[in-house]
Amino acid sequence: MSYVITDETKLTGIIGRPIKQSFSPKIHNGAFQYLNLNYIYIPFEVVQQDLSKTVEAMKVLKFRGFNVTMPHKREVMNYLDEVSENAKIIGAVNTVVNQNGKLVGHNTDGKGYVQSLEDEGIYVKEKTFVIAGAGGAARSVAVQLALDGAKKITILNRTIDKAHDIAQLIGMSIPNVHIEINCLENKTLAKAVEEADVLINTTSLGMYSMEEESIIGEEKVLPSNLVVSDLIYNPAKTKLLQQAESRGCKTINGLGMLIGQAAIAFELWTEVAMPIDYIKKTLFTR
């Protein structure tokens, strides 16, 4: 199908630095074309000192919306007219919607993760989760799990201060969930997963160029009834997921979250559901 840009084409995009590694243009433009929507998604590399001017330009040019990636997810909140509840708690925005000239910030990362679980028949309410890592992704996921009714969340990180920050944030904002923290070590992880429903790796261990690394030393610490989830999607099967499979665990990689968070943004902009099956089959099948 030909893809013709006209004066009626609705503009969307992504701002960040670096930006060339982003899969978002591939996902969104693929979905726009498949659905024959007159939209386009453009990546923009934006340095920090130009962020406020860029956001204002998006409003002036009547962008329907845009994504925000590192390093601007926090600072962009200063230049928006409104921010959603979960984005306020997380303290970061990754999606902006232009609502009749008012820029509204959202965070779809955690929601995209929860959607990826639900797509596999796993529902958050009253479940017990163990999260390895305490960076931005862990924060987004932990907050959304708490908002959606998780029973208990244990956060393990090599530097416990960052885990404490997330626990304190959730404790102040969402008091009905039980939060524990500890250092990320073989012993503490083994103990934490004994009674957990889902283990989530949010660290970089196992990603491309670190394929032989894992958050666990020996797979025997993983109970066979544990769901093991890795936010990494390249490679599709990390060492952690291989270890989990050898124990009979159900495994989920990060592709579902990647597409899930994009799908939520897509629908906020277009009011049309993203063709998720098409995106998975045609854009991410090797």
Curated annotation (Swiss-Prot):
Residues the entry annotates as binding shikimate: 22-24, 69, 94, 109, 233
The reply to whether Amino-acid biosynthesis figures as a keyword in the UniProt entry is yes
Catalytic positions are 73 (proton acceptor)
According to UniProt, the name of this protein is Shikimate dehydrogenase (NADP(+))
**Family stated for the protein in its record:** Belongs to the shikimate dehydrogenase family.
Q: Cite the binding residues for NADP(+).
A: 85, 133-137, 157-162, 231, 254
Q: Which PANTHER family match?
A: BIFUNCTIONAL 3-DEHYDROQUINATE DEHYDRATASE_SHIKIMATE DEHYDROGENASE, CHLOROPLASTIC, SHIKIMATE DEHYDROGENASE
Question: Matching HAMAP family, A to Z?
Answer: Shikimate_DH_AroE (MF_00222)
Q: Does the keyword RNA-binding apply?
A: no
